């Protein structure tokens, strides 16, 4: 059975791919759906305001509040 962490990694990679291929079409899968956006406001957004955003204002953001 696939672990939850593996699913999150796959979703994140998919979001990054979508953000690269159709960045401004769907807002990088972030502002369009806001679920797991690569550059949007998704829960696990890479650069967005997600809860676990790397550079965003998420609860555990790297440089955010």
Swiss-Prot record:
Keywords, alphabetical: Amidation, Cleavage on pair of basic residues, Neuropeptide, Repeat, Secreted, Signal
Superkingdom to which the source organism belongs: Eukaryota
GO cellular component, one term: extracellular region
PTM sites of type Tyrosine amide: 29, 39, 47, 55
Sequence positions bearing Tryptophan amide: 63
Places the protein is found: Secreted
Signal peptide: 1-22
Main location: secreted
Gene Ontology biological process terms, A to Z: IRE1-mediated unfolded protein response; neuropeptide signaling pathway
Purpose: May have antimicrobial activity.
Family membership noted in the UniProt record: Belongs to the YARP (YGGW-amide related peptide) family.
Protein name: Neuropeptide-like protein 28
The organism of origin for this protein: Caenorhabditis elegans
Gene label: nlp-28
């Amino acid at each position: 059975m696939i672990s939850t962490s593996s699913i999150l990694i796959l979703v994140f990679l998919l979001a990054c791919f979508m953000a690269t291929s159709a960045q401004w079409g769907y807002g990088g899968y972030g502002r369009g759906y806001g679920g797991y956006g690569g550059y949007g406001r998704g829960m696990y957004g890479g650069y967005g305001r997600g809860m676990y955003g790397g550079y965003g204002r998420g609860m555990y953001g790297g440089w955010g509040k």
